[in-house]
Amino acid sequence: MKGLIDKLRSNIKTVIAAAAAVVVVICAVVVITQIIGSKSAQNTVIAVYKRDGKSVVRIAGRETVIDDTTADSFACDKESGRVFYRVNSASSDSLYDLCYVELKKGEITEPRIIDYGIEKDYGVACGKVYYLKFNRTIGADDGCVCDPDDKKISTFAENVSTVYTLDGADEIYFIKMHGDNRVLYRFDGDQPTEAARNVTDVYAYNGIEKPHLIFERKSQASNGATELYIAEAGGQPELICDNAVSVMYDNYKPGGSLYYFTSSQESVSWSYVISDSYEESDKGVTRPRRTDYFSFFGVSAEYNEALRAYQDKLIRDEIRAALNESVANGEFSVPAFTAFAYTSSGVLKVADDVDPTKVYSAAPYGEPKIIFESMKVLGGETAMDTLVDIAQRSNIGEVIKYAKSIVTQSVVSDGMAVAANIGGATVSHPLGGYDKSRTLFSFSQDGGRIFALVRDSAGERLSLYTNTLDSSGNPSGEVGVDTGISSYRFTEDSVVYLKSDVGKGTGDVFAYNGEESVKLANAANAFLLEKGDNIVILKNYASTASVPTADLYVYEDGQEKMVASNVSTDRFLCSKEGVIGYISIDESGARSFGIYDGGESVTVSSDVGEITLLV
């Protein structure tokens, strides 16, 4: 079931086309954001595209050709008008030379070298470029920074493995290895300062209003758990939680709720499931002295009883120690945890007794909410005597194996539920009537509505249901929306979907706004969107040519608008500002690079192979 749920979850993040061939080409496309542009896009965007195997850089309507055909990994600092890239290094097959061009006095300069023999990855922030360069003396990478304005290169640290940049931030973060210990440092141009030791996961979020870093390090207080931190651009790392056991990164949308789980008392204590009635009495059991049990006839029978009691106590102590060690090493625990959400208002508790693997949806924004399978822990049904008996007949390893099975069996489903934090208080309501193995659950972006997409018995189409949540988070009742759905995507308070017959490559695009479904387009092969009034639609898909093509439309101001015909479906990009760059192919096979910014489509260049950067 988990595999199916994971597969269903992935459908939220990628658009499923009606035809299998369309799926492949659409999944690589960047989601469209709101169309913005007061000046002609062809004169404001920075773009890089391929022509005759060489890269062409376009800045503010000016162009230059990079003669080195190995040029790739282009990055842009739009404020300075610079485009950075790398080329294969002549010094080594595995290293690169770092270069850039820039717009000066209305013209693009010739390529300039920043440094030779750098490693694969680099980053750009606040006009500076950060990269790694192998230091032969120490046999590890140096972390280097260059400011093209003063043409100065400096080393900010040795033995660096990874660098993380944040948009608009003067500081960067990097990982430096101390033996096997991954240490995260913060560097703001002065001396690097240590941010955290024993770091595990690190994620950088850019291209948003508040760029930030989220990272975890091994907990100093709880084995198997981590400390969870956030570091916003321009700020210092702040602790979110000191005993996280799981974090829902895949569901996280920057600026919204970050869901994570901590151990409850039941989840860290095996004794909640295995009854240990000897725990207190064993503290007073000591090894008997023979001299205390002498009688006229020798050692009394009471001595043998006391010795057996002591030996049993030693076995129980060994079992307790082995169980505690297994729990401390994270080898097993009761899968019933407490769910929290980190929000702009701070940390909010969402629910108790949650198995992180059985959370089926989480509201990205608004008051924290989750749809999950409520778990019930059955405690104390196995006695310590049972474990002692196994240890006497076998060994401690078999005891641990048996205990793990008991712990797993102790957690049973208490039914589907919706849990939320409403006004600072946790609430939970039943959510029944769904077959979890065939249903994908999702919240609307604002968390005010539940959507359920139920796959048909053949597994080919979906039926859409919705359920509004009242002010207490309680579902108001399921409402059927539509059937025969082949692809979908959620917006702030609704869902856009493609409805098509099985075996048919086209269908109609609808938007459900909470009250009714409104038809937006017909004869569509696929669609992409970020907001309900900015939808990109592909029609007349053709896969017979060497390059699959389709006609490109946008849905704006309540109507369809054609952007270009015969557009290569795997060769168009969208900038963060919503400008669309595409390649159209005419009947002769000629390929033209076009730009659309919400006004008219403009042809920028011809004989274009692919678009590699659009900013």
Q: Residue locations for each model-derived region?
A:
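Repeated scaffold domains used in trafficking and secretory/extracellular systems
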Residues: T69-S80, Y116-G127, E158-A169, N198-G207, ...
